[in-house]
């Protein structure tokens, strides 16, 4: 009955694996520090990538440059991708403008994201010391290729250097899907790094019926989603794939004598793929969950949540006082009382004040609405009915008070 934010997953296999990881107590910053920690992570990211049907260029088993890494959060992945893109673009600009210093180049760099992108994208820009431009979304809250092209062309005309674009698949406000199939080719044409943020919705791509939403993934340079949101792996476990990790590795490469070893170059040292140096044995819980649940059970879990969201949406539209504020995607329903924002603010305060269910709001184009996310693996159809009854009862109380 906790329906705020997006899910934070857990399961008994993941909990046991986390306990075992704590007992093993390895700090897997290099291969030599814990070969199993590194090797299992390489294997698990390949397993997971195959479940999503990611292009082979992202997978270590392809024999190419690509590979995956487990970050702590999608916020970290967004920043890591930005810093890799920044390093790549600065190298390119130095070759064409050898007289420009780093400060001059950095001052001209500009990145892009939808106005509906997560706040962590803006934060990555602040931490990376670069400008990020918010591009208006369309009426369905999606970033479109035409809008991105227009923004890039304008910045090029102003003497700026486009270097990075974040395409969101499953926005936080309304679970909208940017048009990767349009934005990717535009970014590729201008040699702009494409990072795909699918933090919540990415788990659904293990189901074939949802993979059309990631059409154009072959145009991306990096892709990220959080198994710890919707795939029964407890926090923290954020999967990230890179087509060419060398840009990130070279950007982060600090190699003191005490971390050197004879196997460098033959296996990844994941300390070069992330912001921290030390890292937990996070691949263990991913392995436990994949082995004990299997793909079909994980798919069934995703599909149940999507069905429950549709059930709640149907209950909502059957009440003439309410309306849907956005298309129902995945396990999220955006709804509101017809009328003013103030009415909906009062309704949310009353719902949460009753203490039976918990929701959070969002606002798009100055329209305030409530978000109902299916969060628990224990949720059943009767819970959706109960939650709707709570919403309806709170609306009744609010109407009585207004009389």
From Swiss-Prot:
This is Aromatic-L-amino-acid decarboxylase. Residues 250-276 are annotated as: Disordered. Belongs to the group II decarboxylase family. One of its GO terms (molecular function) is 5-hydroxy-L-tryptophan decarboxylase activity. Homodimer. Disulfide bonds: none annotated. GO terms for biological process: amino acid metabolic process; carboxylic acid metabolic process; catecholamine biosynthetic process; serotonin biosynthetic process. It is an enzyme of class 4 (lyase). It comes from the Eukaryota. The active site is at residue 118. Its cofactor is pyridoxal 5'-phosphate. The gene is Ddc. Substrate binds at residues 8, 118. It comes from Drosophila lebanonensis (Fruit fly). CDD domains: DOPA_deC_like (cd06450). GO terms for cellular component: cytoplasm. Catalyzes the formation of serotonin more efficiently than dopamine. Displays no activity to tyrosine. Variation in the synthesis of bioamines may be a factor contributing to natural variation in life span. It catalyses: L-dopa + H(+) = dopamine + CO2; 5-hydroxy-L-tryptophan + H(+) = serotonin + CO2. InterPro entries: Aromatic_deC (IPR010977), PyrdxlP-dep_de-COase (IPR002129), PyrdxlP-dep_Trfase (IPR015424), PyrdxlP-dep_Trfase_major (IPR015421), PyrdxlP-dep_Trfase_small (IPR015422), Pyridoxal-P_BS (IPR021115). Pyridoxal 5'-phosphate binds at residues 74-75, 197, 226. The keyword Membrane does not apply. The modification N6-(pyridoxal phosphate)lysine is found at residue 229.
């Amino acid at each position: 009955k906790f329906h705020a934010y997006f899910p934070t997953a857990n399961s008994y296999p993941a909990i046991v694996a986390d306990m075992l990881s704590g007992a093993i107590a390895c700090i897997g910053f290099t291969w030599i520090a814990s070969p199993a920690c590194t090797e299992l992570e390489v294997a698990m990211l390949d397993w997971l990538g195959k479940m999503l049907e990611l292009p082979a260029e992202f997978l270590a088993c392809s024999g190419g440059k690509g590979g995956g890494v487990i970050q702590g959060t999608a916020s970290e992945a967004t920043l890591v991708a930005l810093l890799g893109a920044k390093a790549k673009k600065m190298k390119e600009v130095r070759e064409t403008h050898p007289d420009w210093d780093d400060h001059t180049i950095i001052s001209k760099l500009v990145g892009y994201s939808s106005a509906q992108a997560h706040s962590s994208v803006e934060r990555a820009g602040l931490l990376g010391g670069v400008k990020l431009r918010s591009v208006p979304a369309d009426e369905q809250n999606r970033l479109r290729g035409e809008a991105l092209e227009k923004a890039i062309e304008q910045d090029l005309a102003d003497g700026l250097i486009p270097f990075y674009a974040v395409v969101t698949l499953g926005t936080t406000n309304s679970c909208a899907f940017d048009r990767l199939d349009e934005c990717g080719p535009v970014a590729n044409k201008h040699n702009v790094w494409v990072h795909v943020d699918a933090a919540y919705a990415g788990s659904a791509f293990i189901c074939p019926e949802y993979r059309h939403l990631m059409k154009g993934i072959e145009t991306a340079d990096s892709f990220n989603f959080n198994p710890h949101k919707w795939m029964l792996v407890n926090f923290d476990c954020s999967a990230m794939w890179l087509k060419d990790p060398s840009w990130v590795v070279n950007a982060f490469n600090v190699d003191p004598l005490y971390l050197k070893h004879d196997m460098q170059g033959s296996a990844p040292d994941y300390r070069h793929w992330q912001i921290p140096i030390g890292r937990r044995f996070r691949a263990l819980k991913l392995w436990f969950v994949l082995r004990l649940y299997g793909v079909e059970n994980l798919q069934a879990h995703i599909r149940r949540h999507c069905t429950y969201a549709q059930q709640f949406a149907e209950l909502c539209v059957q009440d003439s006082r309410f309306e849907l504020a956005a298309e129902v995607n995945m396990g999220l329903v955006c709804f509101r009382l017809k009328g003013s924002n103030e009415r909906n603010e009062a309704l949310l305060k009353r719902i949460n004040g009753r203490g039976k269910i918990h929701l959070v709001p969002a606002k798009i184009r100055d329209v305030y609405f409530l978000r109902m996310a299916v969060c628990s693996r224990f949720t059943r159809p009767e819970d959706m009915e109960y939650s709707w009854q709570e919403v309806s009862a709170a609306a009744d109380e609010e109407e009585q008070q207004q009389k």
